[in-house]
Amino acid sequence: MATTETYTLNDFVGDLDRITREETSATRVTERVAPLLAQLVRNPRSIPAEYLRSPAGQRGRYILHRAPKFNVTSVVWRPGDRATAHNHETWGVIGVVENEIEETRYRVTETGAGRAKLEVASVTRHPTGAVSRLVPGDEVHGMYNPTSRDTIEIHVYGRDLAGLKRRRWDDDGTEKPLVSDKYLNC
């Protein structure tokens, strides 16, 4: 059994592969993955250093592992970076490697004509080591780095978000299409 100091990205990917073969429920997958991601983010040395920084002028977004049933990415949020309310179309688990991030969860009620009522369900400031779970039906959130330093996270999703058609909402509830950019390293 790997300890926190020895639990590596390769260990994590192996565990994810096993879990996603054993489980079909998004809730069960995220319940089992969350403590493992918490262990991984406590050992940032296991993530290649080039995937833990943002390029000048943009958010860092790197693929660490791509598999048929899951993807592992690193995301580097610059100070002040914000993602408005958006969905994922899959389960997800997010862990903070360094610094902190503010996550706002929303309940969305479609009102028609490309609009929705967004109700804030919770606002949580996640410190280093914290893990957040997303499951369909409870996977609309916004993210914000309120600090003066980069925030580094590991994101795990049940689908590849690059090119996936999703939705985002402005603060006034206007719905807009969202297609995630490609990763910076592929």
Show where each model-derived region lies:
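A short glycine-rich, His/Asp/Glu-containing loop-to-beta-strand
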Residues: 50-79, 131
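Ligand-binding loop in jelly-roll beta-barrel domains
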Residues: 135-154
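Short acidic-glycine-tyrosine-enriched beta hairpin
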Residues: 108-140, 182
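Short, conserved beta-strand element in jelly-roll/cupin
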Residues: 76-78, 87-103, 156-159
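N-terminal leader/capping segments at the start of a protein or of a new domain
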Residues: 1-42
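Conserved double-stranded beta-helix
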Residues: 148, 154-186
